[in-house]
Swiss-Prot record:
Residues 227-237 have a biased composition (Basic residues). This is Frequency clock protein. Its main location: nucleus. One of its GO terms (biological process) is regulation of DNA-templated transcription. Residues 115-125, 438-447 have a biased composition (Basic and acidic residues). It comes from Sordaria fimicola. Residues 239-261, 277-294 have a biased composition (Low complexity). The gene is FRQ. It comes from the Eukaryota. Residues 410-421 have a biased composition (Gly residues). The keyword Electron transport does not apply. It holds the Pfam family FRQ. Belongs to the FRQ family. Residues 1-153, 214-311, 381-447, 524-590, 665-694, 889-908, 975-997 are annotated as: Disordered.
């Protein structure tokens, strides 16, 4: 316990060290309970070590505590002065400690003594001060002082964490960049990829062209080589096994082919064990059956089509609808197109591969196997042999796989609706009967296989459904048919045949795709059935225009051309053209047939949102994987302005594929490079034009013309100088013998002496009559102007020089060459053409008034009927009345416009010819009042037709020779003229009787 002196000492303020910091509130080392217990433990351990060194074998005391090892339970030992409360009280009351003295370094451990563990006894093996876990005091002192000096080490750790975070982010960006492999669809066909860092653009294009030709030529050779190797390997193995078995019939041979697969052992069964037994066996199989069974297992495991493998391709709803429509239409057309599908040619069977190898003797053929489909029950009156032969011929002709005909045997591998691998053996003995049906192979379930429409129709008919007539020629009916018509098939059946379950689409989505995208199907009202409209071609989409023709197999092309006469004709013309080109020696390299365009990935460089934009050509962008590009934050579009974005353009790689005449360039090209330039492997550039001409800037006028002069507005001397053309000596193809009056009218006369200037008389009626508003007949005049210009002697010198130049042919050739090009460059601008503007001086001007122009003849209206004609139909009268009313309204508006345009027209009398005003009064005006109502209507119509004429009548109906402006206005406003009483009767109507007294 602490005494009173300690208490008085604890009341004083704690002392400070040399740096001004208060000393730690700790007790002195001599009063520390922890150090006391440590000393006891150290002394006990030293006694044990010394006794063991002297050979004393007495009982060894167990240490009460360990200085280093403590249990995590938190319990303390039963010691005298190990009370924590008293320890803290003593430490708080005696905070003075000597830090400068190295011998008085106090312990920082609290007084919680834990129990010993079994591992703590290991410390007793080391002598005092030699435990590697605890360095000497000097080392501890230095480390403690360093910790005090650097009290805040969290800043150092924070800086390290920041550096690691930045490095981790950079590594993630590089990993995303290297994951851009291009297309998932063509990942298996990838051949190699390169990256270009410091290569010039021209050399880079040469390298790309060379590698394209290499990759295109490698496709055919690699396929043939791989097939030859496989055939050679299997053939050698089979024949080596055959030799060993023939030589050693009674014993096993080490060179015989062992059974190295569980599938092979299961397939062969007991015969496989018997084949490798030491003694002769009656159940030993033949060589052909053994090799065939092993080849079946190998081909089954190896010939899994890519269509059955999972493909994680990101497609939009629009693309998925197109794919659904293509799959459904393929059942009826046998053809499929589009960028999402790719034809996988069927691998020929192993027997055909063995036969094709010339150096290896073919083993005996296995017995014929059954067909893919089950036998359909024959109806009465059908010949089985005829059906079998026709079925075999159909299968052989429509097969989508490779066909090999050897010795009268046709082997078709991987054809349409599940007839892949069918073998029709014409030389088989008649006694051999093939089984009814063979097992299903993986290639038979390939969704990308070639469909045979005839077999699909037979299958639908076999199910009891009435299918439509398929081959209806090229005519296609787009009109809807009646619901009770033939040809309706359940939509669920077609979905199963097309294997649409592999696309993960719902029936409602399929109905929506058919109704929106297809023009060949008709859905029923309930949506359960579907009908094919007919024809041999499917729906054509806009994305099918850029489809690569290389995706179609030769057999598919034959099928398509065979079903269409136009296609067959086109194919024959193409073959003839190719043969002529080959005969003339004008064959082109494979790289010339494909126009290579680099592919640019348009993505925004935002870390939160990325978008994929469609660009480049249709044939190249089909191979961009949207799933890979959507995760990229690199901008390849070239629209950036910072240096960092320019550098990102060249981070991608150039990927080449097996047998493809294109490459995927994810690095892009600079924006100033023209995409129309094509570079071949020989380094020749198809784009014409030298470097100097390419560097020029094409100068055009405001109208878009690249000519330096305007032939219709500039003078002939300047035009002749700019075009190097002499008007006095035209070419032979131009004849100027004829006389053109247009040239005399529009070419102004030239005269060098102003005193001898003569004004030529104008022709009659130089300007025709115009119907513009505000133009009067008196506005007819002419102005004669005499101008003076300065004749430049330089133009004459240039003209004489151009006529005597010897390079006229070269200049014409250059002009023709510039015209043929799509974007002609302007001819070189001469220094002499940059002239000052011409100054025109007006010497004299005369104003001549011409005679007023004659007005056009007045418009006349002749009614389409006479008094002799009688109408019985009232509807005709109504239609005539409507026409007359419309014409009256038009005449009223014309009259108002004429008065506004010619205000003094009403003041002067207008004299007209009397012949125009004369008319038959007996037939037109005078009528008997005893006529009926219908004749009154006719007379009213006739009266209004007469009023439209510029004519006035008096009381007895005689015509007048003079019509005043007021009368004309009255007539134009459709007011009736004076009757027998001489007064106006208001507006005329069709019900009035016009009579004279």
């Amino acid at each position: 316990m602490a005494d009173s002196g300690d208490k008085s000492q604890g009341m004083r303020p704690p002392p400070f060290d040399s740096r001004g910091h208060p000393l730690p509130r700790r007790a002195s080392p001599d009063k520390s309970i922890t150090l006391h217990n440590h000393r006891l433990a150290r002394d006990a351990s030293s006694r044990v070590i010394s006794s063991s060194a002297l050979g004393v074998t007495g009982p060894q005391p167990q240490p009460t505590s360990s200085p280093t090892r403590r249990d995590s339970s938190g319990e303390s030992n039963d010691t005298g002065q190990s009370d924590p409360k008293s320890w803290f009280d003593q430490s708080n009351r005696n905070p003075v400690a000597a830090f400068n003295d190295e011998s008085n370094i106090m312990e920082v451990d609290p007084p919680f003594y834990q129990k010993e563990t079994d591992s703590s006894n290991e410390d007793s093996r080391y002598p005092p001060g030699r435990n590697p876990s605890y360095p000497p005091r000097d080392t501890q002192t230095q480390g403690f002082r360093a910790t005090v000096a650097h009290s805040s080490s969290a800043d150092d750790f924070r800086s390290v964490i920041d550096d690691l975070t930045v490095e981790n982010k950079r590594l993630k960006e590089e990993l995303k960049r290297y994951k851009q492999f291009g297309s998932d669809m063509m990942r298996k066909e990838k051949l190699f990829e390169i990256k270009v860092h410091g290569l010039p653009r021209r050399k880079k294009r040469e390298l790309e062209a060379t590698l394209r030709e290499f990759a295109a030529s490698l496709g055919d050779s690699s396929e043939s080589t791989s097939q030859r190797r496989k055939a050679g390997r299997h053939g050698k193995a089979v024949h080596s096994s055959g030799v060993s078995l023939s030589k050693h019939d009674s014993s096993s041979s080490s060179r015989s082919r062992p059974v190295d697969s569980a599938y092979a052992s299961m397939s062969t069964g007991r015969s496989s064990h018997a084949a490798h037994s030491s003694g002769p066996s009656l159940g030993r199989p033949s060589l052909s059956s053994k090799s065939t069974s092993s080849q079946k297992v190998e081909s089954y495991l190896r010939d899994t089509p890519d269509g059955l493998l999972p493909h994680h391709v990101v497609m939009t709803d629009k693309e998925k609808k197109k794919l659904v429509v293509r799959r459904l239409e393929q059942l009826f057309t046998g053809k499929i197109s589009g960028r999402n599908m790719q034809r996988i040619p069927s691998i020929p069977s192993m027997d055909a591969a063995l036969v094709s190898e010339g150096t290896i003797m073919a083993p005996p053929r296995p017995p014929p196997e059954g067909s893919r489909e089950a036998c359909i029950q024959l109806q009465e009156g059908e010949n089985p042999e005829k059906i079998r032969s026709s079925k075999g011929a159909t299968s052989a002709s429509n097969s989508g796989g490779d066909q090999t005909e050897v010795g009268g045997t046709v082997t078709a591998g991987g054809d349409g609706n599940g007839s892949g691998g069918r073998t029709v053996n014409n030389t088989s003995p008649p006694g051999v009967i093939a089984p009814d049906q063979r097992p299903t192979r993986p290639r038979d379930l390939d969704p990308d296989r070639v469909q045979i429409p005839s077999e699909n129709m037979d299958y639908i008919r076999h199910l009891g459904l009435v299918s439509p007539e398929f081959l209806q020629g090229s005519r296609t009916s787009y009109q809807d048919v009646a619901p009770d018509a033939e040809g309706w098939v359940y939509l669920n059946l077609l979905c199963n045949l097309a294997q649409l379950h592999m696309i993960n689409v719902t029936p409602s989505f399929i109905r929506q795709a058919v109704s929106e995208k297809s023009t060949k199907f008709q859905l029923s009202s309930d949506g359960r059935k579907i009908r094919w409209r007919g024809g041999t071609d499917g729906t054509k989409f806009s994305s099918d225009n850029g489809e690569d023709k290389s995706q179609k197999s030769p057999l598919t092309d034959d099928t398509e051309d065979g079903s269409d006469k136009t296609g067959r004709r086109k194919k024959q013309k193409t073959q003839q053209a190719r043969s002529e080109i080959g005969r003339l020696g004008l064959s082109r390299s494979p790289s010339d047939t494909f126009h290579y365009k680099p592919m640019f990935v348009h993505c925004h460089a935002s870390s939160a949102e990325t978008s994929l934009e469609e660009s480049a050509s249709q044939g190249s962008e089909d191979f961009v994987d949207e799933s890979n590009l959507a995760n990229s934050k690199w901008d390849f579009s070239g629209s950036g302005t910072t240096q960092q974005r320019r550098k990102r353009r060249y981070d991608g790689a150039i990927v080449y594929y097996t047998g493809a005449q294109f490459c995927t360039d994810l690095s892009g090209e600079p924006g100033d490079m023209s995409p129309t330039e094509q570079m071949t492997a020989t380094g020749e550039q198809e784009a014409s034009g030298s470097g100097d001409e390419a560097g020029r800037v094409l100068q055009r006028t405001l109208s878009g013309s690249s000519l330096l002069v305007r032939p219709l507005s500039d003078d002939r001397a300047r035009v002749a100088e700019a075009l190097d053309f002499d008007p006095q000596n035209p070419p032979d193809l131009v004849s100027d013998d004829g006389f053109s009056p247009n040239d005399e009218d529009f070419v102004f006369p030239w005269c060098e002496d102003p005193a001898k200037t003569q004004v030529q008389p104008l022709a009659k009626e130089v300007m025709g009559r115009s119907g513009l508003g505000g133009v009067l007949p008196d506005d007819h005049f002419a102005i004669f102007v005499t101008t003076r210009r300065v004749m430049r002697p330089t133009l004459q010198r240039h003209l004489s020089r151009s006529t005597t130049s010897e390079d006229t042919a070269e200049i014409i050739a250059e002009r023709l060459a510039s015209i043929r090009t799509s974007s002609p460059l302007p001819p070189p601008r001469s220094r002499n053409l940059i002239l000052a503007p011409l100054q025109i001086e007006y010497v004299a001007g005369e104003f001549h008034r011409l005679n007023p122009a004659s007005l056009p003849p007045p418009a006349m209206f002749y009614p389409p009927f006479s008094t002799d004609s009688s109408w019985d139909d009232g509807d005709d009268l109504v239609s005539v009345e409507e026409e007359v009313e419309e014409m009256e309204e038009e005449s009223f508006s014309e009259g108002q416009m004429s008065r506004r345009a010619n205000p003094h027209f009403s003041d002067n009398n207008t004299y007209m010819r009397k012949e125009d005003l004369a008319f038959d009064t007996e037939t037109d005006v005078r009528m008997d009042s005893s006529h009926d109502h219908r004749m009154s209507s006719d007379s009213g119509l006739m009266m209004r037709s007469v009023m439209r004429r510029p004519v006035a009548v008096d009381g007895d109906g005689s015509p007048l020779a003079t019509v005043t402006g007021r009368d004309v206005d009255m007539l134009h406003t459709s007011s009736s003229v004076a009757t027998a009483g001489g007064a106006e009767s208001g507006y005329s109507s069709s019900m009035e009787d016009v009579s004279s007294s």
